């Protein structure tokens, strides 16, 4: 007997229809999302299939652009991890040392602070690093032969997640948070507190950062303003004070340091941050540290280098790449950094580029400090104060660590052998001698001071001209370093002439151990000269952004920082304003307003018979490139522009295959998850190596990783 199908009821039909509609909606949304992020998905899940046809007779052609040195990703990543250890070993800066470092093997150390258990390995956005692919601080330090107090560390490791830390949501400050997340020492268990007695304290303080979000200049203000729905009151915020910013020590951090000083034999502070911080309290007084080591963001194996630095297997040779001020709020950049708004743009746009609803405002930044930023401000301010032109400025009170500063476990003696200005080049020769008892590297820093006329072209008093790092010098060994730089480098831009002007006169060339400490100096005489063409292309130079210059002269009058009167022209904090009051018009870009009726449409879709491979070895200016580009269709060009995140698709007309081009400042890492590639330490640490050759090796290593992983660029 045949089975009779039960008729569908209206209720079942409606229910099934609702489910089907929901599934269709989800499918449609998924299709839209997949299409929007197709290139990203292709990169991580595998792209569209492509085939390669070998031309007859090409069997013996050398088609490899570069020779792979490693067999696969695993081997390449292991080699890259070794370089990360080396980079951090040379890029970490020993900021202070009262004889506390290095530590002997077997020393019992107490790792303190939440960042001891939860270190900063990378940044936010494309700088995101997978912590599971990194050596943690505990294991890196233990591997160097130091005995870790597991009682204190175990408690911190079990409890740090109860204390939220800053989270940057890329390009969306409405969901970001600015917590430091440090655990007050009073919250430690009694057993953990007692366990640190008689040990050496390694207090790790950390700050994150990264793409799409600034650190807070006013923690209490940001909390009260509701700028982020996720940044809400808790025990930490109860201790915020008016004007406190994210780069100064918190009450909680000071409590840990104070406890370490009271209970431990030595207090060593490790700065796990890729930015200068206000560390004045650690230099003397209640919170004085015995040693301070800046290690930046660690990357995959930076923690092993930290252990080697602490024990002396690595001798610190890094140098700071910025001034470390005593008070950030007294810096000329502080008042005009961050998001100020034009408040009269309601209805101009509904959402910003990140699809966040507009609040009827538009951001602006007014660049009032001009050339006086970082060490160029502080060293110039010091020179003017010494000359009696900047009352109230005291360099020693304003600066904790100069630019180009760093200590070592040995001592070096530098001598300025010669300075010669011949033709278009200045040549400086210096000798470095290791006057200490252990092997180490030193950095040779050469600066110039140009003649300045009050009311003339704005010029810093001191500018870095060139640098070099020595090889590893054994105790008593010496090395002579030659540094060359073009005379043109000492010229300054003249907006009046629309060219670089090298004023005639005496230029002081100095050898320094940092931006402030002079070893020796000599003077060279230079004839006045104007450079009005680009030194590479020969293109005529001219002022750019004249409209913005006009804006600044009108709206920032008396606040454009000038060496002629630092005190009187010091920038005032920026405030929200109406664009109409500033004499500017904010309008959407309309391409039709810029259409050139006399322009000729470029050739597209031509059948010229060229393939992209035919361009191998061609000069950039070869006319064949134009012939190749004539083959592209408009759809192919727009497709490449609109679908090019982390890879680019195939282009049939020129036989371009689909290629993979990931990016990121920490190597081939990703905000979407693990990649199996190396995570490099932060650029902050790379720069602090002052070692060009080491950075070149790192660049070659990144290329080898790309070859091993099948990346094309």
Model segments located where?
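C-terminal non-catalytic regions of proteins with extracellular/luminal or membrane-system context
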Residues: 1-712
